[in-house]
């Protein structure tokens, strides 16, 4: 085991991690201005999942409030494949917005929709179902092109039991990326913590009494995705908080795969910078070194009696004041 060199966790003396294997991709997705350059000052993105119903209840005023806080870009969520509209994952939600209406409200607020999180409802990632996944991404791409997005990102992990499963999923990802690329849109995958679990080859069994000093068997799911997807078709959005929760150093992953991580999710336990556990100076430094296209703030977790809008605004203030954020 090797200890993290550029530690991105500040509590408990850091987390030990098995060093991920470096890749050497010969190709990469061409650079796209994912985060808007139309606004002077810092360019800050927000994943609208952070607000949920608080935004949907009054979109025009809510969007203006985000612009006033300093956000320039949105990464939206809530795409409905049955209607092609956008809403909320909350089953009680009754507000759904057509793409053209969504874009107009965002444009009127001086913001831009530059990315979107969406996932097919089909859960069986098999070779037989590949045409069905293709159809999902073709329809979704047409609708997202109306929004003018630069990126479409899948944020949910299919069921993966072994390396063969990961290879099939990677091929489905490659096909999705090929579809969106024809529309000038980057396709990406967003991690949580489960991607940093190790899986074995099909039929291989874990050791009953492993040597505690030997390297652990198996390969990280995230690493299998990186190795088995085409850099010309698939990029990755690194959620730095969930990487840390998976006992990983996000800086180390960016070092080892500098041409694959194009977007970041900047996240903390709730408000950005409040917990003191995330080493954001190191994270941003490495992100700029590898040339990320942009980042999106996302809030989850304990509200501590405050509204989500308050958390989003306080997070923006932290990033606006941070000297390490460009």
State where each predicted segment sits.
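C-terminal segment of N-terminal export signals and the immediately downstream linker at the start
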Residues: 19-57, 64-65
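Hydrophobic faces of well-ordered beta-strands that scaffold small-molecule active sites
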Residues: 42-47, 74-76, 113-118, 152-154, ...
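Glycine-rich, proline-tolerant flexible connector loops at the mouths of alpha/beta enzymes
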Residues: 76-101
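Gly/Pro-rich active-site loop or hairpin
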Residues: 52-55, 63, 93, 232, ...
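Active-site acidic/histidine proton-transfer and metal-coordination neighborhood
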Residues: 7-9, 13, 105-107, 122-235, ...
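Active-site beta-loop-alpha junctions enriched in small/polar residues
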Residues: 49-51, 77-79, 118-121, 157-159, ...
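N-terminal export signals
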Residues: 1-24
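Acidic (Asp/Glu)-rich catalytic clusters
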Residues: 34-39, 63-68, 92-114, 136-148, ...
């Amino acid at each position: 085991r090797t200890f993290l060199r550029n530690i991105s966790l500040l509590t408990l003396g850091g987390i030990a991690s098995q060093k991920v294997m470096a890749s050497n991709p010969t190709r990469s997705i061409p650079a796209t201005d994912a985060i808007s350059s139309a606004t002077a000052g810092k360019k800050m993105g927000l994943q609208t999942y952070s607000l949920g119903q608080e935004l949907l209840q009054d979109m025009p005023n809510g969007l203006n409030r985000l612009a006033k806080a300093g956000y320039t870009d949105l990464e939206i969520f809530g795409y409905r494949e049955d209607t092609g509209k956008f809403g909320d994952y909350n089953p009680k939600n009754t507000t759904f917005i057509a793409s053209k209406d969504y874009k107009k409200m965002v444009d009127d607020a001086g913001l831009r929709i530059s990315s979107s999180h969406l996932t097919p409802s089909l859960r069986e990632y098999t070779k037989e179902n590949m045409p069905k996944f293709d159809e999902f991404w073709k329809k979704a791409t047409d609708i997202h092109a109306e929004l003018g997005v630069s990126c479409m990102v899948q944020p949910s992990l299919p069921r993966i039991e072994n390396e063969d499963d990961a290879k099939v999923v990677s091929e489905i990802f490659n096909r999705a990326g090929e579809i969106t690329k024809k529309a000038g849109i980057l396709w990406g995958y967003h991690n949580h913590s489960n991607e940093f679990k190790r899986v074995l080859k099909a039929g291989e069994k874990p050791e009953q009494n492993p040597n505690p000093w030997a390297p652990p068997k198996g390969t990280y799911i995230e690493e299998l995705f990186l190795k088995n997807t085409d850099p010309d078709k698939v990029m990755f959005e690194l959620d730095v908080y969930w990487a840390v929760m998976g006992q990983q150093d996000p800086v180390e992953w960016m070092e080892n795969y500098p041409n694959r991580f194009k977007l970041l999710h900047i996240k903390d336990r709730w408000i950005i910078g409040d917990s003191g556990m995330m080493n954001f100076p190191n994270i941003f430094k490495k992100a700029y070194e590898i040339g990320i296209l942009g980042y999106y703030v996302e809030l989850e977790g304990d509200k501590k009696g405050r509204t989500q809008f308050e958390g989003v605004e306080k997070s923006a203030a932290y990033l606006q004041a941070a000297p390490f954020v460009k």
